[in-house]
Structures are given as C-alpha cells and as structure tokens.
C-alpha cells in the first residue's frame, strides 16, 4: 500500500460496495493501512471449500494442509519485510448459494486481501463471481477450466479482471478417458451420465464436452439427457444403456449419485466392461463403500504420490506429502490434497512478488505474471487455453485390489508422459 493512504481508493469496486452495502466509512481503509504498516504486517486470505455436504470429500484434507504449511505462511518476505499470511476458512456447505454468501462475507466483512477456493464449479464459480464483482484478487482450482470459464460467461478474448484459475480441461479428461478405453475387446458404445449442474452441462455439451470428440474417435454415445443431482432413480438411464448395448459407462457425478446408479445397475442387469466416472470416483472412501463392486472402476487422476513434482513451500515430494497425510490422519491419501497444497504455494509466491501488497491491482498483476513449479506441476498464466486460465497435467487410472484394499493405479499417461504408469487396465 502506498504511504499516502490511497488504499481507501481501491477502485470503484470493493470500497464503494463496502460503503454502500455495509455503511462503513474510512474504518476499513484505516484497518488495512494499519495491517500493512505494522511491525509484522499481515495479508488476509479468505478460503472457501465444502467442509460439509455431498462434496465434503474434497475438503477432507483441509486441516492437515493448513497445519502443515502454517510455519511457511507465517513469514513470507516481500520487499525486504516479513509478512504473515492469515487464512480465514469458511464452509460452502456444498451449496453454490452458500459459497457466494460466505465469499461476500470474507470480502466485505473480513476484508481479505486475496480469496481462494477449490472443489468443483459449485464452489469455484460463485466465489470467483463475488471476487470479480468486488475487484478482489482470486485464485481457484479443482474444477475443469470450461465450467469455470464458460460457466461464468467468460469471453476468450476478454477474460476476467481479478480472478485466475489453474486446473486441467475437458479436452484433457476426454483424451485421458479415450486412451484408457482403447481395448479391442470392448465395443465402442458408451453410456453418458451428466447431471443438470455446471459440471454435467459442461461435460455433456454437444461441442465443448464429450459428444463431438467421442463421435470423432468412433464411439457411439447414448446420452439420455440431464438428470437432477441427488436423484434416487436411474432406471431410465440404465434401460437406455442396455438397449444401446453400451459396454462403457462414463460421465461426471457426485458420490451419492454414482452410488445410487451403480447399485441399481447391478440390480437391473447392466454389466459394462469399463466404468469411468469423473468426480465421484476420486475418493478411496467412496470406492470402499461400494465393496467388491468398487474394484475395477476407473477415473481421471489429477495428482498422486507418484507425480514427479515437489512443493515450493516445504520442499516435500508428492510421495512425502501423501505419506504425511496418511500418517497424520490414518486415512488414505486423496487427489485434492496436492491441489489444496498448490493453491497456497501460489498464494505465497504472489505475496513474495507483488510490488505493493496494499494495492489489489498490484496483487492481481503478480498473479497474472505467475510462472512457478508446484506440487501439481507448472503454474504459468502466460500459457493457457484462454485468458485467466492455465492448465495442469492429467492422467487416468483404475481402482485395483492390492494388499487387501483398493488402490488407485495410473494405467494411462498419454496425455502427460512425464507421470509414470503403474499398471494396466483390467476389464470388469
């Protein structure tokens, strides 16, 4: 922040909203000025994630990640001064409306300098929209870039002002799935399960989603249409897949929906050779809840202990980060662990490089110029499919039985050859 007190003029965005909406006068600017010029200045980071509700698996490792990086965030040097990064976390309750509400609270009441979010479009999009409306620097992950960008009505030639995202895209997951399915003993007939939500509408989109590239690759896709999340009856979809002779089932589902579908599929005699589902099959707890019917299911793999990347914050390898979580929690590692950690790697890097931490525009400029290596791979917003987006590598694999339990094994890496394969896909 500049010494002449211009922080009270953070544009006609955030401050004007604060004064109009909350009836605050100069106090917020004074408080921020005091924070910035204190002997041990603090940057406040708002953090939104689904701690409760059907997406809670994505936030399972939150406490571990924040505790493990607390020391690293307690002293980050910027322009010769040591800054402390204070993280204020709020629960979206797996509800996009609630995500927007808590994001607004973080921005307008807690006066955060940066806001971050992860875990599907239901969290990422409403948080990003609140940040964009208020001119607040925002970094997000854990959501394919198309539902993030186009789900927010983004225009590729314009992008956004203050909101930035790193993750893979639908082109990557489609490529990984097609590579996974390339078995001559399996008919190229696919049943698609796409919910009526941001993810489902993006994955099922005729042009940007699965239908066109599957057709171009020679696959016949049966798409019975969008179903409502938390549905209790998938009989229509199962009947359509059986009639079409589908030997592959794919889509994007929340865990409760897949559990319902897979149980009813067994009861109604649907026997696909390959089942590859996005989102629902990321978590060991979900696969374990399916019993023997969980073995052999397949999914995208964003991050694993075998990924050849390390943390810029702690120096840990992917293997060390995963093992640390397992020891501390007595639970299996999960894929979001790497991305939650990387989110704060990027925050710390931005805090180090920003020319003036008292000015949102300076923080946004530092985000835009990010070019770093994280535990999930490179993050560089000068390279991306559209403005404000940069991509991370993606592979795919299968839940296989090892040592008496289900383990996620990378079985194809054509989309990211630097990530090693651990086995071959086994048909159901």
Residue ranges, per PLM feature:
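Extracellular/periplasmic periplasmic-binding protein-like sensory domains
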Residues: 145, 265-341, 353, 408-427
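Extracytoplasmic ligand/sensor domains, especially the bilobed periplasmic-binding protein
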Residues: 112-224, 274-299
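Beta-alpha junction/loop-to-helix N-cap segments that form part of ligand/metal-binding clefts
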Residues: 57-64, 76-153, 227-234, 259
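Extracytoplasmic "Venus flytrap"
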Residues: 46-67, 90-96, 119-120, 193-204, ...
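C-terminal segment of N-terminal export signals and the immediately downstream linker at the start
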Residues: 29-50
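Solvent-exposed, acidic/polar segments of extracytosolic/periplasmic ligand-binding ectodomains
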Residues: 295, 368-428
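Short, charged, surface-exposed loops that flank catalytic or proteolytic processing sites
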Residues: 352-365
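N-terminal secretory signal peptides
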Residues: 1-13, 20-27
